[in-house]
Amino acid sequence: MSSSSSGNSRHFGRVAPVVLAILDGWGHREELEHNSIRSAETPIMDALWHAYPHTLIEASGAAVGLPDNQMGNSEVGHLTIGAGRVIRQELVRISETVQTGRLGQTPALIALAERLRKSDGTLHLLGLCSDGGVHSHINHLCGLLHWAAAAGLNKVALHLITDGRDTPTQSASNYLHQIEDAINASGVGELASLCGRYWAMDRDHRWERTIRAYEVLTDPNQSISRVTAEDVLSASYANGTTDEFLEPTRLSNNYFKDGDGLVMFNFRPDRARQLVQSLTLPDFDGFPRANQPSLDVVTFTQYEHDLPVAVAFPAESLDDLLGQVVSEHGLRQYRTAETEKYPHVTYFMNGGIEQPLAGEERHLVPSPRVATYDLAPAMSADTLTESCVKAIESGVYSLVIINYANPDMVGHTGVMGAAQEAISTVDRCIGRLLDSTGRMGGTLLITADHGNAELMQGSDGQAWTAHTTNPVPVILVEGEKRKLSGYGNDIQLRAGGGLADIAPTLLQLLDLPKPDAMSGLTLIQAIESPTPSARLPQPV
């Protein structure tokens, strides 16, 4: 370990920081075809990969507490990085509850069913309808239909948000067929509306999008489509509009009314929050609401602490996280990202805690306000880098964490040229971080939270807009004032690791103890040591 005092290595009287750069969506895939990372100009990352200790780690499936072969995502990735252990994710918790028939034992749903039986109100089921597993899962919706039938709720309206981002761009009809089968099997349910996630799941306060979803759910004067849901999709595709951008469409007269109940079955909070805020907060001011139905609302998980809703699956509390350890040792830390990824380096990395820790400073850089990020592939990366360089060179932060959103957000558009530009932008920014960290004698650790931009087209020839299950890189650039002792002449990063090993690695670089609760293992080892057959820790 370092001979410095508890995490505060200094360079000319200033703290030499440990910097964690998370390249969101930067996965590893050897094949060049349809790979925006391998085909982009990346002189900095290429040079670092060849000159410094590096490895590949797992960022999907069991390595992050998800089912095998389930792609990782930003929420899960940042939670796992911050926890230093594998956490059983909400997808797994809820799926197990549905599969074992225990959904009807959930207190929030029991209470909702009882109130709706008394009031004779309609049960509305709202959420992303796909098997992407990032924000929701169609099996959970099917489970809700069977629960509603068993609970004696016969007035059930389905408001389906179409995906096309974590799934193929024109796959909604497949999910419609599954839902129609579930409606027939359960004997309850009516398709009431369709809406692309572009409108219903914004997270950047683009209220002009959210209001479109709000109105199709609440406005009694909305026109009702004269054609079937399948025909709505076909017409949308014919106009060049894919699932993500599907225009909000009313399919029946089953809109939200006073006394109705609502279950929002998305389990990931960040893209569900705005719509639920608009439906529940009495002092909401994002846009004028012509209709404000009084609803009895249950959300699958906690989207925000102050929402007037019941929560079906409350969060499991976590302690001894990376940020907490740094804070408890009296060290200062800096977290920065642009709007699209700001909750991930703060809220999610801190285990769902919204308030900053003692000594934790946060800096938000606004993302450009464009319809899709292929129109601005550089996003706000340069401004973000400038703010991070200032934090690094301030000499007051022991730990600096920055997230670059470009590979993920531009990768989601499926536009190859734009993704290549995004990758090259991030590569250039890493060069600036490297110079700044080096001037301070600090250490730079580079990794990613999941894959995305390394695959831009699927085998069917359609644009690939989803995440991947590919591993992600880790590169360690050791600083002069952060040299680790006890490793002979040199160090290497072991193979066989996962995202849960990032926090233990950072704590070692900071010369801080790893809590027992962190089952992850440091990636650092001496070159002369045999590579351990590291096992991924099991979910807690």
Swiss-Prot record:
<feature type="binding site">
    <location>
        <begin position="165"/>
        <end position="166"/>
    </location>
    <ligand>
        <name>substrate</name>
    </ligand>
</feature>
<feature type="binding site">
    <location>
        <position position="467"/>
    </location>
    <ligand>
        <name>Mn(2+) 1</name>
    </ligand>
</feature>
<feature type="binding site">
    <location>
        <position position="449"/>
    </location>
    <ligand>
        <name>Mn(2+) 2</name>
    </ligand>
</feature>
<feature type="binding site">
    <location>
        <position position="450"/>
    </location>
    <ligand>
        <name>Mn(2+) 2</name>
    </ligand>
</feature>
<feature type="binding site">
    <location>
        <begin position="268"/>
        <end position="271"/>
    </location>
    <ligand>
        <name>substrate</name>
    </ligand>
</feature>
<feature type="active site" description="Phosphoserine intermediate">
    <location>
        <position position="74"/>
    </location>
</feature>
<dbReference type="Pfam" id="PF06415">
    <property type="entry name" value="iPGM_N"/>
</dbReference>
<dbReference type="GO" id="GO:0006007">
    <property type="term" value="P:glucose catabolic process"/>
</dbReference>
<dbReference type="GO" id="GO:0006096">
    <property type="term" value="P:glycolytic process"/>
</dbReference>
<comment type="function">
    <text>Catalyzes the interconversion of 2-phosphoglycerate and 3-phosphoglycerate.</text>
</comment>
<feature type="binding site">
    <location>
        <position position="135"/>
    </location>
    <ligand>
        <name>substrate</name>
    </ligand>
</feature>
<keyword id="KW-0464">Manganese</keyword>
<dbReference type="InterPro" id="IPR036646">
    <property type="entry name" value="PGAM_B_sf"/>
</dbReference>
<dbReference type="GO" id="GO:0005829">
    <property type="term" value="C:cytosol"/>
</dbReference>
<comment type="similarity">
    <text>Belongs to the BPG-independent phosphoglycerate mutase family.</text>
</comment>
<dbReference type="GO" id="GO:0030145">
    <property type="term" value="F:manganese ion binding"/>
</dbReference>
<keyword id="KW-0479">Metal-binding</keyword>
<protein>
    <recommendedName>
        <fullName>2,3-bisphosphoglycerate-independent phosphoglycerate mutase</fullName>
        <ecNumber>5.4.2.12</ecNumber>
    </recommendedName>
</protein>
<feature type="binding site">
    <location>
        <position position="203"/>
    </location>
    <ligand>
        <name>substrate</name>
    </ligand>
</feature>
<comment type="subunit">
    <text>Monomer.</text>
</comment>
<dbReference type="InterPro" id="IPR006124">
    <property type="entry name" value="Metalloenzyme"/>
</dbReference>
<feature type="binding site">
    <location>
        <position position="197"/>
    </location>
    <ligand>
        <name>substrate</name>
    </ligand>
</feature>
<dbReference type="InterPro" id="IPR017850">
    <property type="entry name" value="Alkaline_phosphatase_core_sf"/>
</dbReference>
<feature type="binding site">
    <location>
        <position position="408"/>
    </location>
    <ligand>
        <name>Mn(2+) 1</name>
    </ligand>
</feature>
<dbReference type="InterPro" id="IPR011258">
    <property type="entry name" value="BPG-indep_PGM_N"/>
</dbReference>
<feature type="binding site">
    <location>
        <position position="341"/>
    </location>
    <ligand>
        <name>substrate</name>
    </ligand>
</feature>
<comment type="pathway">
    <text>Carbohydrate degradation; glycolysis; pyruvate from D-glyceraldehyde 3-phosphate: step 3/5.</text>
</comment>
<feature type="binding site">
    <location>
        <position position="24"/>
    </location>
    <ligand>
        <name>Mn(2+) 2</name>
    </ligand>
</feature>
<keyword id="KW-0413">Isomerase</keyword>
<dbReference type="Pfam" id="PF01676">
    <property type="entry name" value="Metalloenzyme"/>
</dbReference>
<feature type="binding site">
    <location>
        <position position="74"/>
    </location>
    <ligand>
        <name>Mn(2+) 2</name>
    </ligand>
</feature>
<dbReference type="GO" id="GO:0004619">
    <property type="term" value="F:phosphoglycerate mutase activity"/>
</dbReference>
<keyword id="KW-0324">Glycolysis</keyword>
<feature type="binding site">
    <location>
        <position position="412"/>
    </location>
    <ligand>
        <name>Mn(2+) 1</name>
    </ligand>
</feature>
<dbReference type="InterPro" id="IPR005995">
    <property type="entry name" value="Pgm_bpd_ind"/>
</dbReference>
